Amino acid sequence: MSLAEFDELRWDHSCDRLDVPSNYLKRKARKTPGGLEELRKSMTSATIYVGNLSFYTSEEQLYELFSKCGSIEKIIMGLDRFKFTPCGFCFIIYQTPQEALAALKYLSKTKLDDREITIDLDPGFEEGRQFGRGKNGGQVSDELRFEFDASRGGFYVPLENRIGAVNHFGARRIRDPHKNHHHHHHGHHHHHGQPHAAAAKVNPMEVEEELDSYIPGQ
């Protein structure tokens, strides 16, 4: 699939334009059937996607900030699909596409609740997209996050579910390969062609491994 019209756009400028689709949208368009048409729709849509929000940012705060770029018809908060609590993103629907582009140009990377928010074009909101798609109900990006983030739920996935014995992430320790494998040959008579089981050699590659169950902070 060719996205030349979005990669090039025949714009000769000394700096990058701000009213263009993100690399994420272009990658998605290449991988998804009908993605190019969806990308074109996002250029004329009055809807924007806002990400990297604090879980504690309110709809009123969003309205106050984004209404500086135009008349807002609706704000749809992103929710954890199990808890129905905010999970760090939203959709904002303006009255015109020009207002949506203005928000993209002038409000991207604005700091809101001490977080640098991200804004992207959106082809249009559909019911169901307000819910997180992660395994635990929130956003996938939070489930991949390793560091503590107080404004986005702390350690979103419990530490013990990501490291230590659960995911076999800790260091491995090999048991003593000679422990409990001493062979006593005194007093035993071996018949020719029938080696005794106790005389079998220990294969170091088959030695049982002991997982290091140490988890930081515990």
Swiss-Prot record:
Domain RRM, residue spans: 46-124
Pfam families (alphabetical): RRM_1
Keywords: mRNA processing, mRNA splicing, mRNA transport, Nucleus, Ribosome biogenesis, RNA-binding, rRNA processing, Transport
Molecular function per GO: RNA cap binding
Source organism, top-level taxon: Eukaryota
One Gene Ontology biological process: mRNA cis splicing, via spliceosome
The keyword Transport belongs to this UniProt entry's keyword annotation: yes
An example Gene Ontology CC term for this record: nuclear cap binding complex
Region called Disordered, residue ranges: 176-200
Keyword check for RNA-binding: yes
Composition bias type Basic residues, residue spans: 176-194
Entry binding sites for mRNA: Y24, Y49, T118, I119, D120, L121, D122, R129, Q130, F131, G132, R133, Q139, V140
Subcellular location: Nucleus
Classification via InterPro entries: NCBP2, NCBP2_RRM, Nucleotide-bd_a/b_plait_sf, RBD_domain_sf, RRM_dom
Functional summary from the UniProt entry: Component of the cap-binding complex (CBC) involved in the nuclear export of capped U snRNAs. The CBC complex is required for efficient pre-mRNA splicing through efficient commitment complex and spliceosome formation; and involved in rRNA processing at sites A0, A1 and A2.
Subunit structure: Component of the nuclear cap-binding complex (CBC).
Protein family membership: Belongs to the RRM NCBP2 family.
Name of this chain's protein: Nuclear cap-binding protein subunit 2
Protein's organism: Eremothecium gossypii (strain ATCC 10895 / CBS 109.51 / FGSC 9923 / NRRL Y-1056)
